[in-house]
Amino acid sequence: LRLLLTTSVLRLARAANPFVAQQTPPDPCYDESGAPRRCIPEFVNAAFGKEVQASSTCGKPPTRHCDASDPRRAHPPAYLTDLNTAANMTCWRSETLHHLPHNVTLTLSLGKKFEVVYVSLQFCSPRPESTAIFKSMDYGKTWVPYQYYSSQCRKIYGKPSKATVTKQNEQEALCTDGLTDLYPLTGGLIAFSTLDGRPSAQDFDSSPVLQDWVTATDIRVVFSRPHLFRELGGREAGEEDGGAGATPYYYSVGELQVGGRCKCNGHASRCVKDKEQKLVCDCKHNTEGPECDRCKPFHYDRPWQRASAREANECLACNCNLHARRCRFNMELYKLSGRKSGGVCLNCRHNTAGRHCHYCKEGFYRDLSKSITDRKACKACDCHPVGAAGKTCNQTTGQCPCKDGVTGLTCNRCAKGFQQSRSPVAPCIKIPAINPTSLVTSTEAPADCDSYCKPAKGNYKINMKKYCKKDYVVQVNILEMETVANWAKFTINILSVYKCRDERVKRGDNFLWIHLKDLSCKCPKIQISKKYLVMGISENSTDRPGLMADKNSLVIQWRDAWTRRLRKLQRREKKGKCVKP
């Protein structure tokens, strides 16, 4: 009653929610947590429904007992692998053998590698006196013996009838005198177990020899010699040489079975047909191939291995930090890592390099604000073509190798105590020694400053007339200062250019030269790390590259409110509103 109630509840649940009945069953190749584990296809009769090639079949020409053209009296090879029952046993039958010896061969192609557990034959005639079973692992190209049956093992097959099986010979075919009796005259059985009596069968996972031994793509059965009816009063003389009075014989088999599993090396739970209708494993664990016998591309961090009960031995992806699509396996690196990792990335992208694409290639450095897996993890060094001694920078800091006297991350300016030269070999040269008497070092203003100039007022107004009188109008940031002879040399960064008659004046680092007397009289007044509006006249000087400013120049601390006004004046100048003074 309880079982009936449970069944009824399940039916109601499926009717209410069809999804309950359609849920995908769990994948046997992974446990409940998603971790890989060994999986194997179901055990099947691999011979069922397969075509069997027989070297001899009765019915052509027709005889009293066999006619290939009459389905009721035909005994084709298809009967060997069809559905047989005890009540309806269909039998294949060979031609009548009038002359002996006469071998009859049955060849079965499994269509794929199988791990064979047994081969069995159920006879409709008396069992043969001598039978040999062979297997092929290369789809019938070559054959190796699997098992012999004979009452005369040494005479027929050159094998002893009772050989001892050891680990040294467990992959060799044996010969037995069992299962060769004449009786029963029908329904007799020959059953060969591939692992029976093999010493390593208990540890099959660790025995490559036995794994190879049970593998087959084709099975061949050779009936070498039938029973001669001496015991039933048959002739002895002339029987084996096919004398005129020899008794006729034939072989007849009702069922050929090959029990085993699709060979998938523990990496698939089933076999399916591919686009060409060939049987292949439905591989998991990042494996591929008809038998899951190799790793998928990019999963070469460790060598392919067969799965075992203890280890799934799944193929692992190479660690390339998302910068490569291909890799290869290196056994030496794998051994050095303690058999943990042997993958080597190929063709690293995004300016990366290394076995794992884990550092930047030459000419680039790491942007530590981004993950190593980011496409922009490596930035170009951008070393100055003149100031840098090479194109390669420090891969951690990005610092380029600077020439003597050059400084900056990209080697784009002269260091303190050096001045720019015209030589690309030595772009910065040391400033020559200065005569102390010619340098104004006092911070006090000279006595004649009042008559010399007047400092600029803070509320200075900019108009079109003053704008037009100047050769350049720029916004600058004062970086540092050094003295050269009677001049103060300021390293500046030009932030904006509002007017310029000299094409060399561009945004970026430059120099501003002011005579020391002008600076001492605070005409103009300048402080380091401040922003200024500079309006002045261009003066070409080979000794002093950059901008020049004097007591007549306008150098006042920058105000953001001027931006709009200066852009307006700039537009008016382009329209021709400036009249040349």
From Swiss-Prot:
Motif Cell attachment site: list the residue ranges.
507-509
What protein does this entry describe?
Netrin-3
**Domain of life of the native organism:** Eukaryota
User: Which Pfam families would you find in this protein's record?
Assistant: EGF_laminin, EGF_LMN_ATRN, Laminin_N, NTR
According to its UniProt entry, what is the function of this protein? Netrins control guidance of CNS commissural axons and peripheral motor axons.
Could you list this entry's UniProt keywords, alphabetically sorted: Disulfide bond, Extracellular matrix, Glycoprotein, Laminin EGF-like domain, Repeat, Secreted, Signal
Under PANTHER family, the record lists: NETRIN-3, NETRIN/LAMININ-RELATED
* Residue ranges occupied by any Laminin EGF-like domain in the UniProt entry: 262-317, 318-380, 381-430
Statement: the UniProt record of this protein carries the keyword Iron: no
The record's disulfide annotation reads 91-124, 262-271, 264-281, 283-292, 295-315, 318-327, 320-345, 348-357, 360-378, 381-393, 383-400, 402-411, 414-428, 449-521, 468-578
One GO BP annotation is:
motor neuron axon guidance
The residues covered by the Laminin N-terminal domain are 35-261
Q: Which organism is it from?
A: Gallus gallus
Where would you find this protein in the cell? Secreted, Extracellular space, Extracellular matrix
Any single Gene Ontology cellular-component annotation? basement membrane
For this protein's source organism, the top of the classification is: Eukaryota, Metazoa, Chordata, Craniata, Vertebrata
Q: What is its main location?
A: secreted
Q: Which residues constitute the signal peptide according to the record?
A: 1-15
Q: Where does the NTR domain lie?
A: 449-578
Attached carbohydrates are found at: 88, 103, 394, 540
Which gene is annotated as encoding this protein in its UniProt record? NTN3
For the keyword Repeat, the answer is yes
